[in-house]
Amino acid sequence: MITPDPIILVTFIGATNWGVGFLTTVAIFAIVALALNLQWGYTGIFNFGVVAFFMVGAYTSALLTLPPPSKFESHILGLELPILMGWFAGALAGGLLALIIGLPTLRLRRDFLAIATIGVATIIRSIANTTEGFVNRGSGLNGIPRFLNDFTSASDYKWVLLVIMLIMLSAVYFGLQRVTAAPWGRVLRAIRDNEDTAMAAGKHTVSFRMQAFVLGGAIMGLAGALWAHRTGSISPTAFNDLFGTFVIWTMVMVGGSGNNKGAIIGALVVGFFWFGTPLIQEDLPDFLGTRVFQLRELTVGLLIVLFLLLQPHGLIREKAQVSRFITCLLYTSPSPRD
């Protein structure tokens, strides 16, 4: 009987656990990338406050599903609602935040919305970190329940969680594929390419931009709720602009904007560099090993520069959309004259 080498076995188990955890995390961030792709890639909306919607969704779901606070905690709600209701509420909170931001800004120039989203993200993080009796301040929320955790063993739960996140990612992907391929999606692309022309064609561009912004915000809120129940604990310091906004933008840029498949591929590629770089810390020289987290930021920054210079359309270029009427005019041979 051949017995496996313990070192090889431990290495294999460790690699498997990391791979499952990596794919689970990337699935959540791919959902956020899909939402940003809807806003920016399809509609041309500059949302530099992605982390705000992600954070609001996470805290909303956590506060609704947690038990009442103990004497050592200080937060509102704690209603012990079912986790599925928490996910729905997280999506609703993200969409509501987008509506509140979009109403006064979407009628203005696009850079005003970008500035507003940055400011809102900073304000929300500051409120969560300093307000007494709201979300437990800097200590964060701990013991957030995990979906189906009571029905599976600890060793199997990582696989269950991966399947759940892949199902959620698939639902968001196919839903967005359907709506962006519909006339609604074509209007969004028309607004992105030339808003004045879309307006001249009789489209209420502000309304369409608001719809895309709110739907994208709701999807980001849903992803935040999934993240909260995946990690089991959240705190304001975990929701920084670098992790929650910069990395997501990089995923969309690398994968290819205006392309839902590209958003997912970009999440895999950028996620590999972002989450994989710390694994090589022990193999790096001392002066780099002690700066491994700065190194991964540099790596992601270099990815942006390289793609902007060499592959500006991303890994998967947006497919040109031509109406069937135009296609018939171009490719149908004219009938011969009598």
Which residues make up each language-model segment?
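Transmembrane alpha-helices and adjacent helix-loop boundaries
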Residues: 1-333, 337
